[in-house]
Amino acid sequence: MAKNGEGLLMSAIMMVVAAALIDREGRVLVQRRPVGKMMAGLWEFPGGKIEHGETPESALVRELDEELGITVDIARLAPAAFASEPLAGRHMLLLLYICRSWEGSPRALDAEELMWCTPDSLRALDMPPADRPLIGLLEAVLSSRGA
């Protein structure tokens, strides 16, 4: 851990991106984390870590291809919300983007399963702590934009 200018300990920040893929019916795609991974069985927005040299948007395009087999144009990603959460000795900063247009049909390439659900039904799902605050923020953004 590093110290900031005031001598306080700071943990390393892990930057993570995720997508709220919204279909024509206004449903959101979530995926269930596979067995063998941290937080296995929990539902999450698809995405992943930003690798060295990547922008958040290019990382998300890569992750959506790797995890779902879909192609997304960076111009179709709209920043929506973020969450901040301590995780395994680090601090995760999760950036959520809304995406309403992509090429291909999402497939569970890295997840146990996929599910389309309405934004209000997300609250009933078991989700990682960092994803939970994004639900209300996502609902607010979608309602202000007319879903």
Question: What is the predicted role of each segment?
Answer:
Residues 139-147:
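Generic C-terminal helix-cap and adjacent flexible tail
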Residues 4-28, 49, 82:
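Conserved N-terminal beta-strand and adjoining loop/helix that marks the start
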Residues 96-98, 107-138:
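NUDIX/MutT-family hydrolases
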Residues 23, 81-105, 115:
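Active-site-adjacent beta-strand/loop module that shapes the phosphate/pyrophosphate-binding cleft
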Residues 71-81:
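A short coil-to-beta-strand element that immediately follows conserved catalytic motifs
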Residues 27-66:
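Conserved Nudix-box catalytic region and its N-terminal flanking loop in Nudix hydrolases
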